[in-house]
Curated annotation (Swiss-Prot):
Coiled coil: none annotated. Pfam families: eIF-3c_N, PCI. Residues 600-774 form the PCI domain. This is Eukaryotic translation initiation factor 3 subunit C. The gene is nip1. It comes from Neosartorya fischeri (strain ATCC 1020 / DSM 3700 / CBS 544.65 / FGSC A1164 / JCM 1740 / NRRL 181 / WB 181). Residues 818-862 have a biased composition (Gly residues). Component of the eukaryotic translation initiation factor 3 (eIF-3) complex. Residues 55-65 have a biased composition (Basic and acidic residues). Belongs to the eIF-3 subunit C family. Residues 17-54, 66-75 have a biased composition (Acidic residues).
Length: 862
């Protein structure tokens, strides 16, 4: 059937306008070569005439040497090649390149040069027969392809990825091309030498086409175009026809123009949208959708913005959904990443009953790209506007596509289980898990219900069946267990972290903690990529928040200290970039850092995180400071340097006003608790409004009040234990409004941990303190003074050694030569045989003031 890809006025030829242009260019080249030959002849004749006209001294000055030069010039013959000979030379050069590539098995070069060879032969055959050297080359290439296939099947020689790609492309093209020269190839294979030596070449008839000017090509009568397809007259008079037969040719042109400059991608998108309207077969629609979605994604690389436009993203999502619908309705068409490309644009592949047609492409890559573009768009939108909420609603469409893509690749993997297909299933399951692990159960339930309602009723998933979509915990557990079983490396580690995060978010502290410990991720997390390390930090923080909600203050503070103690919460959680004044970060590193930032709806509230960390530190630090006030040996123990620094800064203030923010509220509460006023401490801590952001805020405030009562009791006992001989438990119960049973339990724990030197008298219901175990205030001050004196002595001796440059005879206190009472230069003495200085000065260094060792040196000299 004649192609309507191009239409030229005044010509009924079935060839495309591109072939006509090549024909015209060939004729123009011949004309130019003829003109060059004629101009060269004219130049030669003019030179001869000028030489004949030479008269006078010039003519008679020529000697024998000049005659010999003329003979040499006559021997030099200028060879002028015709256009046909030049093309044959180019053909031979191309064949040499193919032969060299065959020796090193470079199929990429063979494929490229084979296409070039065919273009050169097409020009030669327009004015003559097919060259025999071309027949020899294509026949030998086909034999070489068959040998390579046999070696691959036997396992003798395996090709790498790039070689296999070039080999598959070359094999299809050679097979298709050799069909047109089957008779000549058979003659060559029967007797190769006779075929190459014979001169009886059948000249192919050449039809002399009349010269067609550009004016005639521009005229394209619209009445001559059939109405079975669209027709558009483009620039230069080229008629673009959109018919089912020309779809593959259009797609070929679009694919070859990818990555080139000055390519109008919007025009290509409009072209493919028209091709969709005329597409008739599932194969045509699938090919158009695959190219159309890729072209929409290419728009991002040329735009000034770093993210995809909203309208183009929605169009790409609709095209992706339509592509999945076509694939679900036509199970004999499969989009696979390792499939071979169909090279014949003139006809479409035919599918026999029971066979499957594999089309090159990747469904999972499209789903991942849609996910990445949505995330990138959310990163660039102000989260405090309605636009962000509206854009976030598109996540439901994306999640539906992810579930649909998962069901599709599951079916392919079950039909034929291979490593690439298993990897595709793992990738799409991981993407789905990353969209649900940080959400509360209620939100996931709503999302799952809406997703399964939007999908066709006959569609189901074997990993997460439609019937079990109501149980959120089983959903996350099924996704994670599947990845634990079939994946490894980064995907497996990320699945583990997502499950731990989900359990911690839903107040299952002990399960999440045990999973984190058993995974051993804390030991080797530095070996993973940056995004996985960010997920690890988020999971660690969520475990700490879960421990705090459960009332486990020590576990919460210990877990959060690694992230919150550094002061770089924003960076570690990928929730912002801290721009330092003298940073050496390159623009490329900054760009990558911004790409890793999480969208706002995935953020953990940093103010709430800081409040919980400071509150946990307060409950541990205030009793510790009271305990170390009477125990100098415990002075250096610090649990939270951040909290201590803030508390010291607040105490240095001359005037302290009311608490203005969350941090001030926690510090004021700590000061009340240290002073023994636990009621004011509880009132101040509960007045912080950020607790309302947590689930069940009343329960949290009740837990905080109870914790303040217990830590207030411990602080009181640490502070006033040296002043009591015994203390009634009933008195403590009235003072801190705790039950006597609770107070007895707290005191018993303190005694067992050796924090309190006392005994519990259950008969009298009192605490009996042991004297002489702990130091008194006076004894503590004496020990402190002794420590400072020893530090001063060590500092002076170190300074003295530096000033005397390590001389061994400076202030020696041991017995030996030169020591006090020995022979030599002791105090007031002089070494025997040593040099004498005037005035009796022994060894005084000239210049400067002699170091005397300060107060300690004076004491030694005395």
């Amino acid at each position: 059937m004649s192609s309507r890809f191009f239409y030229g006025g005044g010509s009924d030829s079935d060839s495309s306008s591109s072939d006509e242009e090549e024909l015209y260019s060939d004729r123009e080249e011949e004309e130019k070569s003829e003109e060059e030959e004629s101009s060269e002849e004219e130049d030669e004749t003019s030179e001869e005439e000028e030489s004949d006209e030479e008269t006078g001294a010039k003519k008679f000055l020529k000697d024998v040497a000049s005659d010999s030069e003329e003979e040499e010039e006559e021997e030099k013959v200028t060879v002028v090649k015709s256009a046909k000979d030049k093309r044959l030379d180019e053909l031979e050069n191309t064949i040499k390149l193919i032969e060299n590539a065959k020796k090193i098995n470079d199929w990429a070069v063979i494929s490229t040069e084979f296409d070039k060879l065919n273009r050169q032969v097409a020009k030669i055959t327009q004015s003559g027969p097919t060259p025999k050297i071309y027949i020899k080359t294509v026949a030998d290439l086909e034999d070489f392809v068959n040998e390579t296939v046999a070696k691959q099947k036997s396992g003798d020689k395996k090709l790498n990825a790039s070689q296999a790609k070039g080999f598959n492309a070359a094999k299809q093209r050679i097979k298709k091309n050799n069909k047109d020269y089957a008779n000549l190839i058979n003659k060559y294979r029967k007797d190769k030498e006779d075929f190459m030596e014979s001169d009886d070449e059948e000249a192919t008839p050449v039809i002399a086409a009349p010269r067609i000017t550009k004016l005639e090509r521009i005229e394209a009568p619209a009445a001559a175009i059939d109405d079975d397809g669209f027709a558009t007259v483009g620039r230069g008079g080229k008629t673009l026809q959109y018919t089912p037969e020309s779809i593959l040719k259009h797609l070929r042109v679009i694919v070859e123009s990818r990555g080139k400059k000055n390519t109008d991608r919007m025009e290509q998108i409009r072209t493919m949208e028209k091709l969709l309207e005329v597409a008739q077969t599932p194969y045509q629609r699938i090919r158009v959708y695959l190219t159309l979605i890729s072209t929409r994604f290419d728009l991002t690389s040329t735009s000034s913005a770093n993210y995809m436009a909203v309208d183009q993203w929605k169009s790409a999502e609709q095209d992706f959904s339509s592509l999945l619908s076509v694939l679900e309705n036509n199970r004999d068409h499969v989009v696979s990443e390792g499939a071979e490309e169909w090279e014949d644009d003139e006809k479409q592949p035919t599918i026999a009953p029971g066979e499957t047609l594999y089309i090159p492409g990747s469904i999972v890559s499209f789903a991942e790209r849609l996910d990445d573009e949505l995330t990138r768009s959310l990163q660039h939108i102000d989260p405090h506007t309605a636009e962000y909420i509206e854009r976030l609603s598109d996540e439901k469409l994306l999640y539906t596509d992810l579930v649909r893509a998962q069901a599709y690749v599951e079916g392919l993997n079950e039909a034929e289980k291979t490593d690439p297909r298993q990897d595709s299933v793992n990738r799409v399951v991981m993407r789905r898990l990353e969209h649900v692990y940080f959400k509360p159960s209620q939100v996931i339930t709503i999302l799952e219900d809406a997703t399964w309602k939007a999908l066709p009723s006959e569609l189901d998933s074997s990993i997460t069946p439609r019937a079990s979509s109501g149980n959120v915990e089983n959903l996350v557990l099924s996704l994670c267990n599947y990845l634990f079983k079939y994946s490894d490396g980064i995907i497996r580690a990320r699945a583990m972290l997502c499950q731990i995060y989900f359990l911690a978010l839903h107040d299952q502290y002990y399960r999440s903690r045990d999973l984190m410990l058993m995974s051993h991720l804390t030991e080797n997390i530095s070996n993973f990529d940056v995004s996985t390390q960010i997920l690890f930090n988020r999971t660690l923080v969520q475990i700490g928040l879960c421990a705090f909600r459960s009332g486990l203050i020590y576990e919460a503070q210990n877990t959060l200290s690694e992230v919150c103690g550094s002061g770089r919460q924003k960076e570690l959680l990928a929730q912002g970039i801290i721009m330092q004044r003298y940073s050496t970060v390159s623009p490329e590193q900054e760009r990558l850092e911004r790409q890793r930032q999480l969208p706002f709806h995935m953020h953990i509230n940093l103010e709430l995180l800081e409040c919980i960390y400071l509150t946990s530190s307060m409950f541990l630090e205030v009793p510790l400071m009271a305990q170390t006030s009477s125990s100098p040996e415990m002075k250096r123990r610090v649990i939270s340097k951040t909290f201590r620094r803030m508390l010291d800064y607040n105490e240095r203030q001359v005037f302290t006003g009311p608490a203005e923010n969350t941090r001030d509220g926690v510090i004021m509460s700590a000061k009340f608790l240290a002073a023994g006023d636990w009621k004011k401490a509880a009132e101040m801590l509960n007045s912080i409004k950020i607790w309302d952001l947590m689930p069940q805020p009343d329960k949290i405030k009740e837990m905080l009040s109870q914790q303040i009562q217990e830590e207030g009791l411990r602080t009181y006992l640490f502070t006033y234990a040296p002043f009591y001989d015994s203390l009634s438990i009933a008195t403590l119960s009235n003072m801190f409004e705790l039950s006597e049973k609770k107070i007895s339990a707290i005191i018993s724990r303190m005694i067992s941990h050796e924090e309190l030197a006392a005994a519990l008298d259950q008969v009298n219901n009192a605490i009996v303190f042991r004297k002489g175990v702990e130091l008194s205030r006076l004894q503590s001050q004496i020990v402190t003074l002794a420590d400072k004196s020893m530090n001063l002595l060590e500092a002076n001796e170190k300074t003295l050694e530096q000033r005397t440059q390590g001389m061994a005879n400076a202030f020696q206190r041991d017995q030996g030569a030169g020591a006090r009472g020995g022979r030599g230069s002791g105090r007031g003495g002089q070494a025997r045989g040593g040099p004498r200085f005037p005035g009796g000065q022994q060894g005084r260094r000239p210049g400067g003031q002699q170091f005397g060792g300060g107060a300690l040196g004076g004491a030694i000299k005395a």
